[in-house]
Amino acid sequence: VVRDDSIIFWKNYKEFTPDTKVYVASAGKWVAAAVIGAVVDRTDLDWNDNVKKWIPEFKNDVKGMITLRQLLSHTSGVRPYLPEPRVDNYNQLDSAVMEILPLDTVFTPGTRFEYGGLAMQIAGRMAEKAMNKEFEELFQKLIARPLGMKSSHFTPVNTDGGHAPMLGGGLCTTLHDYMRFLDMIYHNGVFEEKQILKPETIHEMQADQVGN
């Protein structure tokens, strides 16, 4: 429990400590979104950019008109998860995104909200293209190292046969590391007097994206 930037209470149970590395599932979604926000801060990538601008393979597909904003706000129409049975045998987001390309949308982009993680793979690939770096490298350079998150990374849950970074559920971190991220969010993008994310990016991350 933190109050006024000071820990006033903490307790751990059994083998779990503040330094135990765990997968935090969907609690990593906004960490991935922060990485993408940091790319928006530094490049021509914009929240309202269409997918096809950065991934030309989508130019003749309805999903090519989906915006980065829709991908990250669960309003894109991209199905929530890959259909079963399906095995992701790809090590990179570029290959993983090509698995999404032939899948039909489940609703017209921008007309509904449906929670899921698959759309974030496309968003991550847009960020990769904008900075010409792989997503894990972006995370380490733009978020993890500036925050001192030394034990955190996006990694495969199962490495058998390879696996692309899971932006919607693949963050492995510790309580200490995660608190550093939360501290930055709470202080409007600032951590230890360093501006990690622009205030307007924090605002976009927390704004109502559906309107109803």
Segments predicted by a language model, with ranges:
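Active-site-proximal alpha-helical segments within enzyme catalytic domains
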Residues: 74, 119-126, 165-191, 200-209
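Solvent-exposed loop and edge beta-strand segments that line ligand/cofactor-binding
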Residues: 24, 109-113, 164-172
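Active/ligand-binding-proximal structured segments within catalytic/core domains
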Residues: 31-32
